[in-house]
């Protein structure tokens, strides 16, 4: 039996594409196989910590921690990287509630959660596994605006 911390930008009820569905299926199958799984994800976009606080619940045998958007009062507009980094910071803070539960491995699902996954793997001093499910170009049918492309690809 392994203790697995999955970090994902999407997990039900936040499902934008296939990522949330994949992580949900993988998490529930790992629980069915006898593993202890925690998924760290986020609350819906555009919500605030007062109306949508960070939650810590168990669903289908999977402990799901969904971080409140932080800082919710910032209007990031088209600054995708600022939003991703701010949300990553919120996810790290939410993940620190696990100090009584130490994973054997952290599994990052996609580049969007690289920051919180790396930070938590280092905090717990455990290996990090990363699956890059898509690129931004792939998510946008091969077209990414100049600003977003420059932010993501440098």
Positions of predicted regions on the chain:
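Short glycine-enriched, charge-decorated loop/helix-capping segments at active-site entrances
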Residues: 20-21, 80-81, 143-148
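Nucleotide-sugar donor phosphate/pyrophosphate-binding loop at the beta->alpha transition
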Residues: 126-129, 137-154
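Histidine-centered beta-alpha loop that forms part of the nucleotide-sugar donor binding/catalytic region
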Residues: 9, 132-135
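Short His-centered aromatic/hydrophobic patch
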Residues: 108-113, 132
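N-terminal subdomain of nucleotide-sugar transferases
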Residues: 1-63
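A conserved catalytic-core segment of Leloir-type glycosyltransferases
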Residues: 35-103
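Structural motif
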Residues: 3, 104-105
């Amino acid at each position: 039996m392994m203790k697995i911390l999955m970090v994902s930008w999407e997990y039900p009820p936040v499902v934008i594409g296939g990522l949330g569905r994949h992580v949900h299926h993988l998490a529930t199958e790992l629980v069915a196989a006898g593993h202890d799984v925690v998924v760290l994800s986020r609350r819906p976009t555009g919500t605030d910590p007062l109306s949508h606080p960070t939650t810590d619940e168990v669903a289908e045998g999977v402990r799901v921690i969904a971080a409140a958007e932080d800082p919710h009062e910032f209007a990031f507009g088209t600054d995708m990287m600022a939003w991703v980094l701010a949300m990553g910071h919120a996810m790290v803070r939410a993940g620190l509630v696990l100090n009584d539960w130490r994973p054997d491995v952290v599994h990052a699902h996609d580049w969007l959660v690289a920051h919180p996954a790396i930070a938590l793997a280092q905090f717990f001093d455990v290996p990090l596994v990363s699956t890059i499910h898509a690129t931004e170009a792939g998510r946008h049918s091969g077209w990414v605006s100049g600003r977003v492309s420059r932010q993501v690809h440098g």
